[in-house]
């Protein structure tokens, strides 16, 4: 029996997020410390195996309430099902004939949940990779993020942008330009300009995430989308500014101007704070890191932060201070 195993890694937005859903620009990194893995093999029926994240057994009603508060109502089964449906639709729309063999598929993930590290899209991307391998269908790399995004936006009605899917498909570090001027359409799929950057250009960076408090990403994004669509100038100007920060960040990386990059990271968060109403515990994470002398911004939708630190002594201080407020700190593995 041939067993197909595919992984997709957590990600952190270095600069520009959350402008990816608003024709902005971002730089993101993949974090190989955390991953989702999907295993698929031939079976006599289509069998989606429940994961430990799809909890249905609780110690008490209070345990159930706590699980919902931290992780929301949904596990990964709906993501796998929606990915399969979207893949089949993609192939049908292009007259790509699929063989009639069935499969069993299961997933597991160690990506911290609901802290903005793209745990949901990692399951989708890993599932999509398994399906392409099983059916011998090769979706062009530049189009894969858009197909993965459509699983959430079209199948599940979740507000999301391309950033997470781009970095999980490309891996490493990627500069992304979502301006309409660079928009391209191939085989009915819309995509944008994605440029790989050498991870060796990165300064010493940390990622810290809270392991007790969280907020589902789909909840986080909804209000800003409505304000943007209504033409609120504060939100529109902020999204444009995120793009400018990203262009400057790319230049800072290429010239190894780490002090400039660090300042841009701080400015990214300050701009975000000007348009979002943020929970105090998320602000506290950023301010705690800054008091250590590091830069800090959200790595995603909130619950995890990323920034530049100076040396090992500073990193140890960050770890200690973050632990004191219930957060864990890592050095992300990026390659």
Feature-to-residue mapping (PLM):
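Short glycine/threonine-rich catalytic loop with a Thr-x-Gly-x-Asp
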Residues: 117-119, 295-301
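DPxDG-like acidic metal-binding loop motif
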Residues: 117-137
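Glycine-rich nucleotide-binding loop
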Residues: 100-102, 302
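Helix-loop-helix module between adjacent transmembrane segments
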Residues: 83, 113-115
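Short, charged, amphipathic alpha-helices and their helix-cap/turn boundaries
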Residues: 104-105, 142-145
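C-terminal nucleotide
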Residues: 1-15, 19, 28, 32, ...
């Amino acid at each position: 029996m041939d067993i197909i195993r595919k992984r997709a890694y957590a990600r952190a937005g270095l600069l520009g997020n959350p402008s990816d859903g608003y024709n902005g620009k971002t730089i993101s990194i993949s974090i190989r410390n955390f991953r989702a893995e999907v295993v698929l093999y031939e079976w006599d029926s289509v069998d989606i195996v429940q994961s430990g994240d799809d909890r249905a057994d609780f110690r008490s009603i209070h345990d159930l309430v706590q699980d919902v508060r931290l992780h929301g109502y949904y596990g990964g089964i709906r993501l796998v099902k929606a990915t399969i449906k979207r893949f089949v639709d993609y192939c049908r729309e292009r007259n790509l004939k699929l063989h009639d063999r069935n499969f069993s598929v299961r997933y597991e993930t160690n990506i911290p949940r609901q802290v903005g590290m793209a745990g949901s899209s990692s399951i989708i991307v890993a599932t999509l990779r398994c399906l392409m391998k099983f059916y011998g269908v090769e979706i062009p790399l530049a189009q894969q993020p858009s197909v993965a995004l459509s699983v959430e936006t079209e199948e599940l009605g979740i507000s999301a942008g391309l950033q997470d899917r781009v970095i999980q498909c490309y891996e490493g570090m990627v500069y992304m330009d979502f301006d309409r001027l660079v928009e391209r359409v191939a085989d009915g799929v819309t995509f944008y300009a994605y440029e790989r950057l050498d991870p060796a250009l990165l300064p010493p960076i940390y990622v810290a995430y809270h392991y007790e408090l969280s907020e589902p990403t789909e909840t986080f994004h909804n209000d800003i989308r409505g304000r943007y669509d209504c033409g609120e100038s504060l939100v529109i100007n902020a999204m444009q500014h995120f793009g400018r920060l990203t262009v400057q960040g790319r230049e800072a990386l290429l010239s190894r101007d780490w002090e400039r990059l660090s300042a841009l990271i701080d400015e990214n968060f300050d701009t975000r704070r000007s348009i979002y109403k943020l929970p105090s515990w998320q602000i506290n994470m950023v301010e705690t890191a800054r008091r250590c002398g590091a830069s800090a911004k959200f790595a995603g939708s909130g619950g995890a932060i990323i920034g530049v630190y100076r040396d090992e002594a500073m990193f140890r201080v960050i770890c200690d201070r973050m632990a004191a407020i219930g957060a864990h700190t890592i050095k992300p593995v990026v390659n």
